Design a protein with these regions (language model features):
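Conserved strand-turn element in the central/C-terminal portion of the radical SAM core barrel
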Residues: 166-191, 195, 211-214
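N-terminal [4Fe-4S]-dependent radical SAM core
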Residues: 1-54, 59, 63-69, 259, ...
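Alpha-helix N-cap and loop-to-helix initiation/capping positions
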Residues: 153-160, 187, 223-234
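Alpha-helix-loop-beta-strand connector modules within alpha/beta enzyme cores
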Residues: 100-111, 163-172, 229-253
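Acidic (Asp/Glu)-rich catalytic clusters
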Residues: 78-81, 130-134, 167-172, 200-201
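Core AdoMet radical
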Residues: 45, 62-73, 80-97, 103, ...
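Distinct, well-ordered alpha-helical segments
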Residues: 100-102, 126-133, 191-195
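Auxiliary Fe-S-binding modules of radical SAM enzymes
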Residues: 1-8, 193-194, 198-295
Length: 295
């Protein structure tokens, strides 16, 4: 029996290795320093932060942890001259800001060669607002496949709004549309293939599946919600769920993680765990003053 189990594990390990070798880096991660393993302390590509406020209160969110600890970045541009890509934004919900259209236009003029990415929970995106925005990539967060589960995770009854946002961006083929999903085993692992199927049916181009980072202030909330902390750190579990979602959509996992996994052999992939705990999230890029005046 022991030999049979070992053979089965080796077969699964080889399948995981093949899957990893074939995976592409998320479109959003392209140009990020994390893809270059020769960089000792890589940072995320630049972002423009509009507000740390959010109309969701997600049980896993790093942004609300930063707010509680007084470490959320102040509004402004965090990056450098000649960026390849800029995200609006990494903290808070950018569509809450009345300056979203103004800043979007300013960044397009100020950095005409840069790719502009919008990261949003989608709940405030309407057809009217969408017509005023100009982005190359839109990432919409969705971590549940039902209204009830979505409300439990986000503490907001906005599931239908988020689905509508996916429909809006999925229909616009001038942008790369991405559903951004956090892997929370015990909470949403069964939802992830359903999210992938739903997003694909709405014309969304890609799923960016990310491993959970457990921030200390969120531990109790995640525990009450049913998180399996051990499985949350298992690369094997993450990859198995990604393989299931791949049946429906172009699924990709975090680029800085993927480049490391591609260097591992099959059995290492099968057995490795990722330490997923962190006390406080920090922006590692310096704030740079740029003008935001409209012509």
């Amino acid at each position: 029996m022991g030999i049979e189990v070992e053979i089965l594990e080796n077969k699964e390990a080889k399948e995981l290795k093949k899957f990893v070798d074939e995976l592409m880096v998320p479109t959003h991660c392209q140009f990020c320093q994390g893809l270059d393993l020769s960089i000792e302390n890589p940072v995320h590509h630049p972002s423009y932060e509009l507000t740390p406020a959010c109309n969701h209160d997600c049980i896993f969110c790093y942004s609300n942890v930063a707010v509680k600890l007084g470490k959320a970045p102040k509004p402004g541009y965090y990056g450098w001259e000649n960026p390849r890509a800029i995200t609006i934004s990494q903290y808070g919900e950018p569509l809450l800001s009345p300056r979203i259209v103004e800043v979007n236009k300013m960044l397009r003029r100020r950095f005409p060669e840069a790719r502009l990415d919008l990261q949003t929970n989608g709940s405030l995106l309407t057809e009217g607002l969408w017509q005023k925005l100009d982005f190359d990539i839109v990432m919409i967060s969705l971590d549940a496949a039902s209204r009830e589960k979505h409300k439990m995770i986000t503490n907001a009854d906005t599931f239908d709004n988020v689905v509508n946002a996916l429909r809006i961006v999925g229909a616009d083929k001038s942008v790369r549309s991405i559903v951004r999903t956090i892997f929370m085993p015990g909470i949403n692992d069964e939802d992830i293939p359903k999210i992938a199927e739903l997003a694909a049916s709405l014309g969304v181009d890609e799923m960016m599946l990310q491993p959970l980072t457990v921030h200390k202030l969120n531990e109790e909330r995640l525990r009450k919600a049913g998180l399996d902390f051990e499985r949350a750190e298992s690369i094997r579990e993450l990859l198995k769920v990604a393989m299931g979602a791949k049946k429906y959509i172009d699924v990709r996992i975090s680029g800085c993680l993927l480049v490391q996994l591609k260097k591992m052999d099959a059995l290492t992939l099968y057995n490795i765990y990722k330490i997923s705990k962190e006390i406080s999230p920090l922006v590692k890029r310096k704030k740079m003053g740029i003008k935001a005046k409209l012509r």
